């Protein structure tokens, strides 16, 4: 393939761009909404963390999900992840999740256990019903001491459902 001078420059710029990935876990879809908005505004690739045993996404069964989440937390379980996610090809990884029992779901621990984030930039975001980030951003810093963890974005569940575009835009500008 033959490239002209300007095309060569464009290809070189693309090669030098930091590759970004948005990874998220979402049962009710609110973290997914925020993840999709981040991917849209950054041009990042996007991947869902899929549980090997799917969680019940029927909101009428919230209490059952809450009990299961508490049991997983109390027993320090690591739920299996169904899909493989290529984090090695990315420099910057946005990681999103809902808050369960004032922390992230145990499957997020599985995700951090499974992959090496050394030398990468991690940018967390989460959805919640009033607990903010619950200290999870500091937990990520402890779990991944060889990664650079930037300021995260906590989004209230109703704000995610009503459209997080402005909050995401403001947050992304603060990171740059």
Predicted regions, residues:
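Short, charged, surface-exposed secondary-structure boundary motifs
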Residues: 55-59, 134, 159-162
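Glycine-rich, charge-decorated loop segments at or immediately adjacent to ligand/cofactor-binding or catalytic sites
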Residues: 130-143
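Loop/turn elements at helix/coil->beta-strand transitions in domains of secreted/extracellular proteins
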Residues: 90-92, 119-120, 147-148
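Short beta-alpha junction loops
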Residues: 126-131, 157
